[in-house]
A protein has these predicted regions:
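Alpha-helical transmembrane segments used as membrane anchors
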Residues: 1-211
């Protein structure tokens, strides 16, 4: 009796799993195109980002006034410089200021790659690997620029260039290791990361240097 129940449970589990797979397979093309478009839109919004749009951003409470034709809201929307209007200005402002700065544009390329891989049904193992590479490169770039911002602290060097992630992590590292130490660790991390990408054998390199 117990064996029969376990077989029924296993059968239902496989049936539900196959339904999920068939749904994804059936709509794979649609999902891939949607993801590709989202990535392309994200890239365009970041490319056309300007701090000037910050003063023209419509708050959540004002979104409803767009439909009622509020004059002040309409003027804000007309002064928006982003190529994708209010939505592009809002998305780019969040990504640039609250993630990796201008390096967050790589998030758009990640979405495009996901869309292409799904569309052509390619091996997703490589896709996951390169997604990690691009995310880590975005983080390291943000960290490097955050170090430059905090060490040199010029007014021309805006915080948007590194984002809050790079600025925060760089601040912690500078407090722990000093400016020179933080920059050294960041640059070494870059070299090790690039070595992994091109598959450098660091042991062989060390041996050849020793010889």
């Amino acid at each position: 009796m117990m064996a029969l129940q376990s077989k029924n449970i296993e059968y239902k589990r496989r049936k539900n799993h196959s339904k999920g797979e068939s749904f994804l397979t059936k709509h794979r093309i649609g999902f891939s195109i949607l993801i590709f478009i989202l990535g392309f839109v994200l890239i365009l919004s970041i490319l056309s980002y300007t701090p000037k749009d910050q003063a023209n951003l419509v708050s959540i409470s004002e979104i409803g006034k767009i439909l009622t034709g509020d004059e002040q809201v309409r003027e804000k929307l007309e002064r928006t410089h982003n190529w994708l209007g209010f939505v592009g200005a809002k998305v780019s402002y969040f990504l640039i200021n609250y993630t990796f700065g201008y390096s967050s544009i790589l998030l758009g390329f990640i979405l495009i790659f996901w869309g292409l891989f799904l569309f052509f049904n390619k091996d997703r193992g490589k896709l996951v690997k390169w997604t990690f590479y691009l995310l880590f490169f975005s983080f390291l770039s943000s960290l490097f620029l955050g170090n430059l911002k905090l060490i040199f602290g010029t007014e021309e060097f805006k915080s948007e260039i590194c984002g809050i992630v790079g600025l925060y992590v760089a601040d912690v590292m500078i407090k722990l290791f000093g400016g020179l130490g933080s920059m050294f660790i960041t640059l070494v991390s870059f070299l090790i990361f690039l070595g992994f990408i091109v598959e450098v054998n660091f042991y062989d390199v060390a041996i050849s240097i020793g010889e």
